[in-house]
């Protein structure tokens, strides 16, 4: 079978080491060497790989991945699913982390980052950056042109960075 676009995307998202690690975990549960594992074992394999799906998430994942209802998942389907979980985890985490960053950067706690605060942040991270560059970043980030960056604008700026 030809790999689907999703499967190719999943492989390109992962490093060779990660694929090998996932394969090793997958193979432990592929007891008959048939190249697939039971959906019942999926949660165990995911937890071995550091994921923590809830029962509901797991059911939703199985329903999505086991399209033919065979009760089994092959390795390519497994990769797609792991990548999806990793991306969702990263998104959830990064928003919390960014909210935390925003609070730290917003020195006077007015709910905005101004160009002075932005300059401090960038310089403290070891960037050698000119005032012109800071103004440029402010202009790019400040979508409503009020001279300061609110949390939504900050999130959009950071999306561009990641």
UniProtKB/Swiss-Prot annotation:
Binding-site list for Ca(2+) 1: 30, 32, 36, 41
Residues reported in the UniProt entry to bind Ca(2+) 4: 142, 144, 146, 148, 153
MF (Gene Ontology): calcium ion binding
Keywords: Acetylation, Calcium, Metal-binding, Muscle protein, Repeat
Modified residues (N-acetylalanine): 1
Residues that coordinate or bind Ca(2+) 3: 106, 108, 110, 112, 117
GO CC, one annotated term: myosin II complex
Protein family per UniProt: Belongs to the troponin C family.
Note: Skeletal muscle troponin C binds four calcium ions.
Name by which UniProt lists this protein: Troponin C, skeletal muscle
Protein species of origin: Pelophylax lessonae (Pool frog)
């Amino acid at each position: 079978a030809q790999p689907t676009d999703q499967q190719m995307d999943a492989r390109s998202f992962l490093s060779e080491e990660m694929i090998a690690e996932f394969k090793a975990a997958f193979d432990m549960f592929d007891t008959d060497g048939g190249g697939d594992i039971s959906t019942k074992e999926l949660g165990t394999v995911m937890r071995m790989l550091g994921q923590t799906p809830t029962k509901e998430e797991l059911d939703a994942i199985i329903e999505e991945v086991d399209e033919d209802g065979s009760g089994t998942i092959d390795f390519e389907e497994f990769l797609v699913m792991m990548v999806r979980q990793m991306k969702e985890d990263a998104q959830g985490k990064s928003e919390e982390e960014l909210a935390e960053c925003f609070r730290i950067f917003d020195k006077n706690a007015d709910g905005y980052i101004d160009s002075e605060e932005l300059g401090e942040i960038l310089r403290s991270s070891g960037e050698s950056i000119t005032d012109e560059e800071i103004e440029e970043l402010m202009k790019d980030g400040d979508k409503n042109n009020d001279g300061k960056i609110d949390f939504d604008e900050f999130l959009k700026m950071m999306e561009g960075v990641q």
